[in-house]
Amino acid sequence: VANHGLVFAWGPQSHKVIAYIAELNLSPEAKKYIVEEFNINNLADVAIWADIIRKKRKNERPWHYTNIKEGEWVYVQERDCPDSNCLVEKIKTFSKIVADTHTLFIERRDALKYLVHFVGDVHQPLHLGNLKDRGGGRIRLFNSGKNVSLHYLWDGGLIDWEKENLVEYATHLNSRILDSEKSEWLFNFTPYLSLADLDAGLSLI
């Protein structure tokens, strides 16, 4: 969550792990379509693209988070994002662009790259919150003797990435997801999209 233009983001490793998990849950047809239609062999290769270009496109910073009114627990678009310039609404927007074969190739390809990243962002709980604690940035605690923010820990500070193989870690995490959970994520639409919705969106093409 951000304030006055300040934006926190999942670390590169976290985004790539999420992208690997997403790819493990794509149908063979959807995976083939991504390769042939968009020339993207691995979703992890484009997982941090939106963070890279955000440095130059400051107007896109609000796309990486959604602020929900303090005291509320459910996202309401009319109240929380009336201009549609937030993470939740951008996921919806780019999902439609990816599925629209009448849209220019470069726009659809960029939309897919945004989607891979933003679905990762929305799975970081502190990207959906209120401004009061700046997405956990103002909550300080000690971890391994270091004074760090709660947001830092969520972004990857709890994992020693130097000791982790990203593909193996993603495979391990994916193995812990029940088939019933995947089905629920796929068919039970929530205010934000789950990883499985990428597959569902592509199936409409």
Give each language-model segment a name:
Residues 8-118, 125-205:
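N-terminal, motif-rich segments that launch catalysis or mediate targeting to/interaction with membranes
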